[in-house]
Amino acid sequence: MKLPKAQLWLILLWALVWVQSTRSACPSCGGPTLAPQGERALVLELAKQQILEGLHLTSRPRITRPLPQAALTRALRRLQPKSMVPGNREKVISFATIIDKSTSTYRSMLTFQLSPLWSHHLYHARLWLHVPPSFPGTLYLRIFRCGTTRCRGFRTFLAEHQTTSSGWHALTLPSSGLRSEDSGVVKLQLEFRPLDLNSTAAGLPRLLLDTAGQQRPFLELKIRANEPGAGRARRRTPTCEPETPLCCRRDHYVDFQELGWRDWILQPEGYQLNYCSGQCPPHLAGSPGIAASFHSAVFSLLKANNPWPAGSSCCVPTARRPLSLLYLDHNGNVVKTDVPDMVVEACGCS
């Protein structure tokens, strides 16, 4: 298992503080001697590193152009299930970031910024477009994928749609047609024309589609995500009592508002950053644990570099579960993903 460097050094530092103060044979066997404020600051820093590592980010996204509230609310309604139950897929809402309005009333160019990592795992895509109430009659739409900036020359047909009503319309697109380049840029050209024979160019509204503000076009994507440990049985360990000396689960709730991250993490409002701590007497040594877990790997590293007695046992996680997140990425896309192994549910002696 490849260890996250930031988390490794952070927990390593914390563990060394415990060892120096308690002289324990295992850094998770005793409670921290840090003051409550110092411990809380360490927990918050660990939460930041854990979230960034789980999302494969080196730094938090900077939101320079907030989405319109109505558009954001609509995206959340589409992405947020009735309950935030973790699954094995990601959902993404990507708003058109650049709209090149052609001089023709019947053509528009939409540009989306997607992650190249999504390309090979994309299995469902829909383009949402808004037809204004002022449009009369029947509208015929065709969608093309462009290979160049202005769609000159090569282009690929993706879908067509016919409607007689205003409001939002969803066009299912072939996922193979949305494979992004290394840059992640996807350009779609829309061609639309009225089918009502009584409609003339002079009598048509200036724009046949809404392409700005609350009616901004967007892509709805579903992506398969590899989730290590999917289907792992959940075993819960009661929260440690204040004076419990034995191995147990200690709970810390981290509020994203406290981290200053509520501008880009939309849901949930926080999560449980639990960890395992306590003594492991000889009769508990070797109880079921996760040999390759992050905690046990850190403690194994500590053992290898310190003269601790052979056979000492450590308190490590024995069950974890993923954390479902709704967040804004660096490109302003709304992403729903399940970060694996984020929440410790049970502890045991390794």
Curated annotation (Swiss-Prot):
It comes from the Eukaryota. It is found in: Secreted. Glycans are attached at residue 198. Residues 1-21 form the signal peptide. This is Inhibin beta E chain. Disulfide bonds join 240-248, 247-315, 276-347, 280-349. Belongs to the TGF-beta family. InterPro entries: Cystine-knot_cytokine (IPR029034), Inhibin_betaC (IPR001318), TGF-b_C (IPR001839), TGF-beta-rel (IPR015615), TGFb_CS (IPR017948). Disruption phenotype: Inhbe knockout mice have a lean but lipodystrophic phenotype and have a severe fatty liver due to increased lipolysis in adipose tissue. Deletion of activin E does not affect the body weight, plasma glucose, glucose and insulin tolerance, liver functions, or food intake at room temperature. Cold exposure induces a rapid induction of beige adipocytes, and targeted disruption of the inhibin betaE gene blocked the emergence of Ucp1-positive beige adipocytes. Homodimeric or heterodimeric through association with alpha and beta subunits, linked by one or more disulfide bonds. Inhibins are heterodimers of one alpha and one beta subunit. Activins are homo- or heterodimers of beta subunits only. Residues 22-236 form a propeptide. GO terms for molecular function: cytokine activity; growth factor activity; hormone activity. Keywords: Cleavage on pair of basic residues, Disulfide bond, Glycoprotein, Growth factor, Hormone, Secreted, Signal. GO terms for biological process: negative regulation of adipose tissue development. One of its GO terms (cellular component) is extracellular region. Inhibins and activins inhibit and activate, respectively, the secretion of follitropin by the pituitary gland. Inhibins/activins are involved in regulating a number of diverse functions such as hypothalamic and pituitary hormone secretion, gonadal hormone secretion, germ cell development and maturation, erythroid differentiation, insulin secretion, nerve cell survival, embryonic axial development or bone growth, depending on their subunit composition. Inhibins appear to oppose the functions of activins. Its main location: secreted. Pfam families: TGF_beta.
